[in-house]
Amino acid sequence: MNANPKFISANAHVDEAAVAPLPNSRKVYVTGSQPDIRVPMREITQADTPTGFGGEKNPPIYVYDTSGPYTDPDAKIDIRAGLPALRQRWIEARGDTESLQGLSSEYGRERAADPATAELRFPGLHRTPRRAQPGKNVSQMHYAKQGIITPEMEYIAIRENQRRAEYLESLKASGPNGAKLAAMMGRQHPGQAFGATAFGPNGLQEITPEFVREEVARGRAIIPANINHPESEPMIIGRNFLVKINANIGNSAVTSSIGEEVDKMTWAIRWGGDTVMDLSTGKHIHETREWIIRNSPVPIGTVPIYQALEKVNGKAEDLTWEIFRDTLIEQAEQGVDYFTIHAGVRLQYVPLTANRMTGIVSRGGSIMAKWCLAHHKESFLYEHFEDICEIMKAYDVSFSLGDGLRPGSIYDANDEAQLGELKTLGELTQIAWKHDVQVMIEGPGHVPMQLIKENMDLQLEWCDEAPFYTLGPLTTDIAPGYDHITSGIGAAMIGWFGTAMLCYVTPKEHLGLPNKDDVKTGIITYKLAAHAADLAKGHPGAQVRDNALSKARFEFRWEDQFNLGLDPDKAREFHDETLPKDSAKVAHFCSMCGPHFCSMKITQDVRDYAAKEGMSDADALKKGMEVKAVEFIKSGAEIYQRQ
């Protein structure tokens, strides 16, 4: 049973491990053009450079922060009350929505009236759902096409810039060498962006609210922001912005409780999950999702067909448009920000999977394929796509058009079924855009490295640059237990080529349901892949953190090395396995090479010698080699000598 009977809403509490601030970090807020636009960032404090290395100040580094109020010591966290509705005033001020009398989905009303769910229900929601007024469209894409810069767009522009300009100014003011230091720390290798317009020599130096608006209006980016999820902090998914990552959570029929899923969500966002998908497939899906949404500062995605299938006791052939429609409305009124909908699985494509090694591996894809075959007709998702668009624009739910025919092995990569579905997704994108509904496209899957760029290029062409959202791809099939690595390789590559969001893979992929440790491992692996892609594309400011960590490493500022990394806890743990004493945190060596063979220590010795003798580093190195050559000859010119 997936909702553990021991979970009682009255006893629910936050996971303490997810609340503590990260080491040497504090939450800061950057205010926009109005007081309630307060954009969170994580400020990482650095130690001064030791006197022997120049004794300069190292100002704080600012990094993108997805953890919401959870890592803010000033915030009062009560998961029974949920997070503050920070976007509520913006939504109401637009004057194009209305509060409903109550839930309008039949299933939602049934759950609310069912005494069996009373102890599981989220107790802290004291507002009714909102919906667009008749004839209105409340999507961020609709506003963007009208030329309107929303507070969400301004928020995103501030967030994407990560206070880079302020950091460089603080370097300039840090001392006599400030200008030189700013030039060094702001230096970045030119990227290869494969046509992404924001990058390159003539690209943007900072993201502006107007640029955000233009990209959303064009369909190259989406802002997943359901009007019934006002707790969410606005973010953007598009190839001209930082590469984002998604974390999957969710219960199953055999494991996990509501409390555990909320804990997984708070844990995932602590380590950098930009969005979270609730893929619950067991009982009490409705209640689990409510708890997650009300406590999530990041967009929440779902696959509505999973819950619809539960409503017909797991029999795909019994699914109907009416049941699915009610499920969409139920979830939209809870606040789901994006729906994965497998509308591209058409009857004509199903036979194309017959010769595959691994057939149809997508759960949603297999459900719809089975329905198509049972009824020998087109999927109701495809036939009712415009009806779905009407629902999406009434709540501002974004499409994540599902790749139900994605390859489940590298053997099946880039086959006719996969690419046929991709073309259909491109056609559906144009229909959604007619309704000003935001769209991203889901992608594979299992793809060897040499075929990855073809996937990206075809998606850009056929889907008119709508954001691509890929699961990996996994580049080989030989490593169960290590698929976070097999997929991380492909994720870094496809992120570089243009994918806007990467869906994480944990070590448990293909093996079991991930626990909290697996979630963290998947998140860190994919943050690494996304950052590598940002560097390769030449995203403005992407290299600042790398430069800061490299400088800390060269100056033996161990604590700063740990704290500037993606996982300070793991870095500190590995260091302390061999050098646990506090004195080792200031030592000019590590356990790899020891005190006499540290390359960075030797380099610093050369620089000290050069300064003492009044010569350049190169001259000092040459002089030192000459001195050592004389010593070698005087000692007998033997490579191995007795001590």
UniProtKB/Swiss-Prot annotation:
Binding, substrate: 248, 277, 306, 342, 362-364, 403-406, 442, 469
Binding site for [4Fe-4S] cluster: 590, 593, 598
GO biological process terms, semicolon-separated: thiamine biosynthetic process; thiamine diphosphate biosynthetic process
GO CC annotation: cytosol
Cross-referenced InterPro entries: ThiC (IPR037509), ThiC-associated_dom (IPR025747), ThiC/Bza_core_dom (IPR038521), ThiC/BzaA/B (IPR002817)
tRNA-binding among keywords: no
Function of the protein: Catalyzes the synthesis of the hydroxymethylpyrimidine phosphate (HMP-P) moiety of thiamine from aminoimidazole ribotide (AIR) in a radical S-adenosyl-L-methionine (SAM)-dependent reaction.
Record: residues binding Zn(2+): 446, 510
Cofactor or coenzyme needed: [4Fe-4S] cluster
UniProt cross-references to Pfam families, sorted A to Z: ThiC-associated, ThiC_Rad_SAM
Entry protein name: Phosphomethylpyrimidine synthase
Mitochondrion in keyword set: no
Keywords assigned: 4Fe-4S, Iron, Iron-sulfur, Lyase, Metal-binding, S-adenosyl-L-methionine, Thiamine biosynthesis, Zinc
UniProt signal peptide: none
UniProt superkingdom: Bacteria
Co-factor note (free text): Binds 1 [4Fe-4S] cluster per subunit. The cluster is coordinated with 3 cysteines and an exchangeable S-adenosyl-L-methionine.
EC number: 4.1.99.17
Pathway(s) the chain acts in: Cofactor biosynthesis; thiamine diphosphate biosynthesis
GO molecular function ontology, one term from the record: 4 iron, 4 sulfur cluster binding
Record family assignment: Belongs to the ThiC family.
Catalytic reaction annotation: 5-amino-1-(5-phospho-beta-D-ribosyl)imidazole + S-adenosyl-L-methionine = 4-amino-2-methyl-5-(phosphooxymethyl)pyrimidine + CO + 5'-deoxyadenosine + formate + L-methionine + 3 H(+)
